[in-house]
Structures are given as structure tokens and as C-alpha cells.
């Protein structure tokens, strides 16, 4: 159906705009509301639907989303910022905490670093990124701080070594 809006959007995406997008009228801000603020709130509403869907339809009790814990940790990197802007902070923190705890239960972090030896991106995805994200929403939490201090210690003792001058 050439008039089906969602179908046209998909077709536009996969066909490199071969037939153009359906018409779209940008919503206007109410009187007295700055356009940037209106659009920011609209954007946050869209993102809330995104995170709600992932938590409601994909996250399981163990804490993962089904994409493998390391890739799942990529998914939640934007959540602390959203929570700090007021998008369901308790819910997003609970979801992030469940994922971080699953990473540690699964043995993906040993002595502060990734258990597996891999390139720097994938080593970070093995849980250090989830621990870092946790600190934004759990400032001063003993377990979060302990996990990150183990990472700092590992970097200090095994990764970033002094040069011949002792620096």
C-alpha cells in the first residue's frame, strides 16, 4: 500500500530515499514555551518509550536483555543520562543494576578487569562500562565504588606501568 505511512518510512530507509519520505509536519510548541525545550521534552518521551519497551519486553529476571551481557551493556550506556534528566530514574537504575549484577555473577570481571583477553573495546564491554554507568546513579554506593576501585587498582598495577624515570 503506497499510502501506508510506516511502510513508506521503512521503504525510504532501505531504498536510500528512492521515493521520498511521507509528508511530516513538525509539532509546534505551545505559546510561551521555547521551541528547543518543547522538542527536548518530546524527544525524552520517545526515548522513554524505547527504554520501556526494552525493559518490559526483553529484560529477564537474571538482568540481561538477550543480546549477550557484553552487548547488553552497550544498550544501557545512555540510561544514566536519561535518569538524571528525570526519565524514570528508579526504574532505569533498577534495570542497570540488574544487568551489572548479572555481569559480575557471570564472572565477566576478575580483579577489576575483563576476565577474557580481547581488544580494548570488547574488554570494556565485558562489564567495566556497566560499572562506570552505575556510579552516575549510585554515587557513593559501597558495592559500585568497590567494583570501580578494583578496576582502578588493576589499571595502576597491571596496565599503566611507570616509565624508566618512575612516572
Map each language-model feature to its residues.
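Glycan-recognition and catalytic cores of secretory/periplasmic carbohydrate-active enzymes
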Residues: 1-167
Amino acid at each position: 500500500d503506497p499510502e501506508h505511512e510506516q511502510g513508506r518510512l521503512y521503504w525510504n530507509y532501505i531504498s536510500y530515499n528512492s521515493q521520498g519520505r511521507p509528508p511530516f509536519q513538525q509539532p509546534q510548541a505551545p505559546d510561551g514555551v521555547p521551541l528547543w525545550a518543547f522538542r527536548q521534552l518530546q524527544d525524552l518521551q520517545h526515548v522513554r518509550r524505547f527504554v520501556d519497551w526494552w525493559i518490559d519486553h526483553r529484560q529477564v529476571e537474571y538482568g540481561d536483555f538477550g543480546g549477550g551481557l557484553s552487548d547488553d551493556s552497550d544498550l544501557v550506556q545512555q540510561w544514566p543520562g536519561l535518569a538524571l534528566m528525570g526519565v524514570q530514574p528508579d526504574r532505569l537504575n533498577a534495570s542497570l543494576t540488574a544487568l551489572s549484577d548479572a555481569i559480575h555473577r557471570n564472572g565477566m570481571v576478575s580483579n577489576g578487569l575483563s576476565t577474557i583477553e580481547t581488544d580494548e573495546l570488547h574488554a570494556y564491554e565485558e562489564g567495566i562500562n556497566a560499572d562506570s554507568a552505575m556510579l552516575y546513579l549510585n554515587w557513593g554506593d559501597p558495592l559500585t565504588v568497590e567494583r570501580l576501585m578494583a578496576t582502578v587498582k588493576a589499571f595502576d598495577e597491571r596496565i599503566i606501568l611507570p616509565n624508566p624515570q618512575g612516572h
